[in-house]
Structure formats: C-alpha cells, structure tokens
Amino acid sequence: MSISTFSECITGAARSASDLVYKLIYSKRNRLIFAFVLTFVTLTLMTLTDRYGGGSDDDWAISLALSGRLPDSGLCLFVNAAISQITLALNTAFPAQNWFLVIEFIITATAFFSIIYGSLTYMKPLFGFLLIGAVEAFVLPGCTYESNFTFVAGIASLAGFLLLVGSTKTNSHSVIIPVAGIIFCVLGFLWRAEVLLLSIPFFAVALGFIFLSRQNRKSSISTSFSLFSVVQASIPYIAVIVLCGCFYAYNQAAWQEPEWAAWKDFNSPRSELSDYPMPDYEKVANDLTNHGLSKDDYFAPLMWITADTEVYTTETMEYLSSLSSALTFDNYLANVSEYLSNVSKSMPSHIILVVAFAVITILASRKKTALPQILVSLGFALVICLYFAAIGRLPERVETFIWLYSLSAIFLSIKHNAYDNDPNGTRKKLTEPYKTREVLASTTGLLTWVVATLLVLILTVPKFNPALLSAYLNQDTFRPNDPATEYASRDDGKILVWGTASYFDVEHAYRLKFLPSEDFLSKNLFLGGWTDRAPYTMANRERANMTNVIRGLAENPDAYLIIEEHREGHLPNLVLSLIQEHYYPNATIEKVESFKGKGPKDTFSVWKVRI
C-alpha cells in the first residue's frame, strides 16, 4: 500500500467518524439515545462486577450507620441529616436493599446521563467527548464498584454546574435543564458539601468568561451585557444557594440533639489525631504525665484505639489534638515534593495526563484565543492542589475533581452555541463540507472517548457477574465466603472485639456493598474508628455489656480480642498494657485460638484477657 493510498484511507476514516459525530450532536434525539445507552451499559458493567473496593470503606460504614440494623440510628457524620433520615426510613421500611447505595446508584446514573447530554450539547465535540471519557475512566469506578460518597458528590456537582452554566451560556429557554442542574447541585451538597464548594471558583471562572465574551461581541440590546441579563441568569444559582442554606440549617438543628452533639464533639479532635502529624513522644512526655497519660495512652488513638470511654473522654481527645505539630515550611515542601513524585510515578493513569492532552488540543484548535481561560482555570486548580498537598490532605478522589472542574470550566467558557437553538443552521451544517480542522477535532474527541470506553470494557467485562443482581435486589441472600466472616458469624456466645485494620477482611467479604445481619453486628465490636461514641455504637455496646470496650475485654467473660497478625500483631500487648495501667495491674493475655484467613499471608488470632 502506497503512502498516498494509506493517507486517503485515514482521511476517509476521519471523515466517516466526523459524519457520525455530527449526526449525533446535531440531533437532540440522538444525543438522548446515546446518553441513555452509554449510561446503561457502563453502569451495568460497573455494578454487576466482581471488582470491588477502593481506598476507603466509608460508604460501607455509612450504610451500616443508616441501615436500621443498629439500635438508636439516625444521623451520620459525613452526609446531611436529611439524607441520613431518608435513607434510614427506607432501610427500615424495605430492609432487603442497601438504600444508601441504591440512592448513590440513582444519582450516579442520572448525573452521568446528564453529563453526556450536557457535554455534547454545550461543548464542542472535541471537548465534550474528552470530558465524557475522563468521567468514565476516572469517576465512574469511584461511584460504582469502589463505592465512595465523595465521588458521588463530585459527579452530582459536576452535572449540576454543567447544566446550569451550559443553559446560561446558550440563553436556553428550557425549564427542565436548569431545574435538573439545581437538583444535582443540591444533591452534591447533601452528599458532601465540601465537594460542591470546591467547584464554585471554577464555574465562576466559566461564567465570568462567558459574560465577558458577550460583552466583547455585543452588537445589539439582545446581546448586551445588561443588568437584567445578569439578574435573569443568576436565578438558578440563587436557588442553589437558598436550598443549600436551608439544608445546612436543617443539618445544624439535627446535630443539636445532646447525644449526636456529643459524638460530633468527640470525633472532631479524634479525626485531627488521625489526619495531622503528631510530635515525638519524648517532646510531650512531661505534659502527658501531668495529665495522667502514659506513652501507650498517647499512641493508642494514633492507631484508632479510642474505645475506652473512661480514659478517652472528649476533654482528653481535645488535649491530645492540641499537641498536634504545627506544619513547618520544611513539612510543606516535603509534602509537595511527595505529591509531585507520586504524580510522576502514576502518570500513565493519572488525571493530569488528561489535563495536559486537553490543553494541547485546545491550543492546537483554538490557537491563543482560549489562553486566558486556560491560565486562570488551571492556575486555580494548581494552587488548590498544591495547598492541599502541602498540608497532606489531597487524596485522589479530591484531586480528580479539582482537575475535572477546571477542564469543564475551560470547555464551557469557549464560544459555542447549543445545536438546538438554530435548526436551520443545523440542517445547513449537515449538508456542507466540513473543514479539515473540524474533522480532526471531532475525530480526536471521538477517539479519546473510544479509548476510555475500551479501558472500562477491559476492566469490567472479564469480571462481569450478572448473578450479583439477586444480591442487590435482596442483600440478605448474599453469602460471604471468607474464614474471618465465618468465624465472626459463629453462634458460640463470644463477643469479638476487632482491630480496625483486621476487620477489613469482613468488610471485603461483604464486597463493601451488602450488610450483615443485626445479630452479627451485635456480637462484633471495634477498638475505635470514626463511629466510636456514635449513639448507635454505644447502644450496640450496651447490648453486649461492653460500654467501655477496653475494660470490657477484661471484665466480660465472653469478650475476646481478634486480630490479623500480619497487620496488627502489636495490638494484644498494647491492649493488655492499657488494661494494666488503668484497671487491672495483674491482668494477663493469652492466645486461645488462631485460623488462616483468605489471603495467603493472613493469620487471625483470638486473645483472652484474664484478671
């Protein structure tokens, strides 16, 4: 095959691909069908999959908190009180489903559908397909088989602002689009308010450039940058602020109840101990001694051991958190350096690669006209990422949305009128020859989406398991297959107290999706964690006569400590030391049983404290 023939084949393929793209984007019906089919296929593959788990078990813990399978449930620290109460009511009325995950699935599906439709409507095809592909590859896994509520809040917020800014950009007369945008923004706020707030500067940038563009090209009253147009365009955003404010006030009122306020007051310093660096023991030893705290008392909360209600009071936790090290300039530099190193190591699969590709394609297709948007929006993203990296608070789920918000703001701010606003122009566009640059741009966008979709298919199709559908419809039919879960389910009268890291095996046995029975939960307790001192946790402990878990390990004849030796082999001696220091100086601890876990290196051991 000659070079000229090969070139003709490539050109022909590109024009054919471009024809498909324009037939899709110039038809509202086709965009809706495409959005529905892509949403249905990807969400089905990512939900009915043997892949599960990610970097966090928070969704599983939230699901438990709102399951109705623990006494005195009601609120959860991470989501708005309104969501907590609705989820709890649904779980109580229809316990066969895990309603927290059901609601997350509905939000994810509708938000992704809206992102597809909105991207192809309010952005040029190159940018629209690029954003859809990025969401498929970097966001949907976190919303589905990895199951993290931060990703769900992020995809809802992204969909909301995309619809709102898109309708503002095109002066859309549709009522459905802005209403849907308002709903998604509010859902993002309810699921995790910080994620919605993080998007505001980027979409403010998009709106700013959109209004500046109108001002620069005004030629009549209808296109002028008038006060009336600003007020009219502001109505949906004001609605978002008002609704979020109402839900914020409702949440604040719900947390005024004494038992819930006490949990929140305790968890605040507890989380600081987990999230911020602490000084070496030697530097604070004298202060700790003056407060009646030992070396073990100091280190235990750093390992999520706080279930001693007599030692670790709210006042004690506040004192310990006050010792947290103030970050020095050297710490900031070290954290930023570590962040940059991690980005370089994970570059083939890092969101920053999409950002770089997007910038290159924008500059190639728009020359310098989009440079201000790029500099401002990416500048915001870089500053925010470096700030969170410097203080050590930039997990992947946060970084991903910072860059996606930034890209979306750039894509939306670039001049483009919605196809639905000019039917005559659409018909003309479909019949006239395409410019070479348009063909290249639309083909490039389509190819990036195809690559992202192929990646999704490669990851999910081999793990597709339609048999899971029955478990989603009735979670009580799910039977975990794991030695740790089998041991924890035995009806032998034992009350098991788990190390937090050791309990991960049980969580993963349930695929971080399905919930154990009320009986199971009543006889499996923990040494700490963010649910410590929650009213439902304390009520569950009281049922087992283990209000003070550390002391209960010594005093309750049915209580046993269970750990995975590879991860938490140090815990038996630490727990014994805490008991000896505060309650029974002559207490001893012995291993009474052990068994192999599911992993090749996992060995679980069961310990009994004797007094």
Residues covered by each model-derived region:
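Short periplasmic/luminal acceptor-recognition loop of GT-C membrane glycosyltransferases, typified by
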Residues: 485-570
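Membrane-proximal stem/loop segments at transmembrane-domain junctions that anchor or position
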Residues: 253-331, 519-536
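Signature aromatic-anchored transmembrane alpha helix within multi-pass, membrane-resident enzymes
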Residues: 29, 175-179, 229-240, 418-464
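Membrane-interface alpha helices of multi-pass inner-membrane proteins
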Residues: 139-140, 176-193, 204, 237-246
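Extracytoplasmic loop-helix module adjacent to an early transmembrane segment
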Residues: 39-76, 88-91
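Transmembrane-helix motifs of polytopic, lipid-linked glycan transferases
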Residues: 106-125, 357-364
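Short hydrophobic/aromatic helix or loop-helix immediately within or flanking a transmembrane segment
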Residues: 73-98, 102-107
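Short hydrophobic alpha-helices at membrane interfaces in multi-pass membrane enzymes
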Residues: 125-131, 163-186
